[in-house]
Amino acid sequence: MKLTDDSHLSNPLAAREAALVAAFRERSHPTVAERLHLAKRAHTTRRVAFGADVRLLSDVAPRSGDLVLARVDALGQHDKLQDPSGRRVSLFVGDEIVVAYGHRYAPSQFEALVPEDLGPCHLAAGGGIAARVVAANTRMSEPTALTPLGLLADARGERLNLAGAALAPRALPAQRPPVFALLGASMDSGKTTAAAALIRGLSRLGLRVGAAKVTGTGASGDPFLFRDSGAREVLDFVDAGCATTYLAPHEQIEAISATLIAHLCEAGSDVIVVEVADGLLQRETRALLEASFSHRAFDGVLFAAADALGAAQGVRWLRERGHNVLAATGLMTASPLARREAEEVCDAAVRGVEQLESPLVAAELRSRVR
């Protein structure tokens, strides 16, 4: 696919239409607040309140987490936007949308970076991430093209950033319920499905389950699945003030994890299930799991993989770093043959989704952590 910043300008008719719409909007002189009221707002921005005195900043360098009003110039891979409620809203050329800047790491989709200016960029994720795509999976269509119209700011001219609406920071509690972590070999290895199944199994025991996604790209799907599976309280890194966690400092990843776990404890959780995005070799995931913090934060881990070899190597990698590996799971358990291979070579019990949903299996896993 072609990843040029001006690809959306190649259609002269579309360019003229966009100019005409912009001219009519200019004549009507809507306030920024009125434009924001009509704009389609992304799920990533759900915690930020807009006042009537909101303004737009131009000629500034965006930062990760900054909110931006942008115009859709060409539809591509993402032709829908998840709104604050999680509904997938259809997009049209000329729409104004409110999204958050953020880096994106998604091997099955895009790698995208926050640009150094407010020039043309892309909708890098359906949850509402503005960034400039620098690499794409060959299966992807062209990214949806955006023109930023300005960063959102308050009456004092201070930019609105997700960090300003975050949960209060917390340290990792000294006394807390057990925390299970779902890890994986890669993106799309079955982590989220396994996490949801474990939540279901623990809930069927009568436990109050809290769930969190501590790294990844802001979107509604995974948290909604956790809640549907029985979690009483669900949080993610957006609640901790980040649109995405790609390229975030390691200290920030630890702070996000501690804050989310602490707030789930305060909500009265009997047990907590945490998902860490992507695979063991991804930058932030690897740093987190190689740090001593992860041993204090996670009492037991389950590892998801798409095949037996990945499961065996992942379990070994985690054990070498001192983690309490409770089971291997993931996509490979959907195939009886792959599951059989994993059972032969993996130094951990192999548990499929249907087993993790069982209160008997959930009770057995619960008994193997503090």
Sequence positions of predicted segments:
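Extreme N-terminal, non-catalytic leader segments
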Residues: 92, 97-103, 108-111, 115-179
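Charge-biased, low-complexity intrinsically disordered regions
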Residues: 83-85, 116, 120, 204-208, ...
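N-terminal phosphate/diphosphate-binding loop that engages ATP/GTP or pyrophosphate donors
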Residues: 200-244, 251, 316-320, 336-346
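Walker A (P-loop) phosphate-binding motif
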Residues: 163-217
